[in-house]
Design a protein with these regions (language model features):
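Short, aromatic-enriched amphipathic alpha-helices that serve as compact interaction elements
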Residues: 22-49, 158-174
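N-terminal "first-domain core" detector
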Residues: 155-193
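Low-complexity, intrinsically disordered terminal/linker segments enriched in charged
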Residues: 38, 99-134, 138-160, 243-311
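Surface-exposed, charged secondary-structure patches
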Residues: 60-118, 187-218
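Short, well-ordered alpha-helical segments enriched in acidic and aromatic residues
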Residues: 41-69
Length: 311
């Protein structure tokens, strides 16, 4: 009986040692995976350390076009802010969920380039999700950002369809009333969006139409103008289209009509509309996207009487 008890005790010790050893192995793997947590960028070599679906989602997110600067800003701050620090990871524990899934609990502190740390209060807790695929442990999620990415991509695609419908309307219905150029490239600065249903929406914005001729590598402005107001969009088959456009008036009635059309969004609109620097920054960003999407050999644009602006 004593011998049996001794054997059982020994087996328990061996099992415990194996469990501890496995935990230590997983901690080491988690520490290695921490090197590939996205921080302001997604490293190409991260592909080998992430599950296919997680890498594909992040790759899609990091390559989504930005209509305005920092549209996807939250992506850049997975573990650090914008203060020039470096994320220093510490794996506290690893919890096995089943034979092929585990969660590593991390503490992340911010370290300066001289290897000193910021205030201890800046230390944050994070979760690194691990999945064993073909015998190799990979990162499958980080702080549930996988679902964040799925939601964000769905929203982006919906907004992209809305933007395309508005751009088409401005180019075809509004742009045709101006002196024509080789290309019409609208500028959209969206103030607010209200979805009336899954198939209908109202979008308030500061909209601009610009017609250009491509001379050498320069898009030279031929004509253009502002058309602020509210666009009414509805599904037409598989696509969205503008069914109505309520514009602000020109001249003396401009302010009154803008207040009526924009309502509670007026202050945001006015702040946007009156800031030429913001408008030009958005214009440049959207011009770059158009040039890339349409394979134009343009590197700058030029309004009449002004110097060319490099893109």
């Amino acid at each position: 009986m004593k011998q049996l008890s001794f054997i059982l005790c020994l087996a328990g010790i061996v099992l415990s040692a194996c469990t501890v050893g496995k935990q230590e192995d997983l901690k080491g793997i988690a520490e290695e995976l921490c090197q590939y947590v996205p921080d302001h960028q997604l490293l190409e070599r991260s592909r080998d350390y992430m599950t296919d679906d997680f890498y594909a989602l992040l790759d899609t997110m990091f390559n989504l076009p930005e209509h305005e600067a920092m549209d996807h800003e939250w992506l850049y701050y997975f573990v650090t802010g914008n203060g020039g620090t470096i994320a220093d990871f510490s794996v506290d524990t690893v919890e096995m969920k089943d034979a092929t899934h585990a969660i590593a609990l991390l503490t992340v502190r911010q370290m300066w380039e001289d290897s000193t740390y910021t205030d201890d209060e800046d230390a944050e807790e994070h979760r690194l999700y691990m999945e064993k695929v073909d015998g190799k442990w990979l990162m499958s999620d980080f702080d549930e950002h996988k679902q964040d990415c799925i939601r964000h991509i769905a929203i982006w695609r919906k907004e992209e369809a809305q933007r395309q419908a508005i751009s088409d309307y401005l180019a075809k219905e509004i742009g045709r009333d101006y002196l024509q150029g080789e290309v019409c490239i609208p500028v959209l600065m969206l103030v607010a969006t209200e979805d009336d249903s899954d198939d209908e929406a109202r979008i308030w914005g500061d909209f601009w139409v610009f017609n250009y001729n491509l001379v050498g590598d320069t898009l030279k402005t031929v004509s253009g103008g502002n058309h602020s107001g509210c666009m009414y969009l509805a599904k037409d088959g598989d696509k969205l289209r503008v069914t109505r456009f309520e514009q602000t008036e020109d001249g003396a009635g401009n302010e009154e009509s803008a207040k009526r059309i924009f309502g509670s969004h007026y202050d945001v609109y006015q702040g946007m509309h009156s800031n030429e620097d913001v408008r030009e920054a958005v214009r440049q960003e959207q011009l770059r996207q158009y040039i890339q999407a349409n394979d134009l050999q343009a590197t700058c644009y030029q309004d009449y009487g002004w110097d060319a602006v490099k893109l």
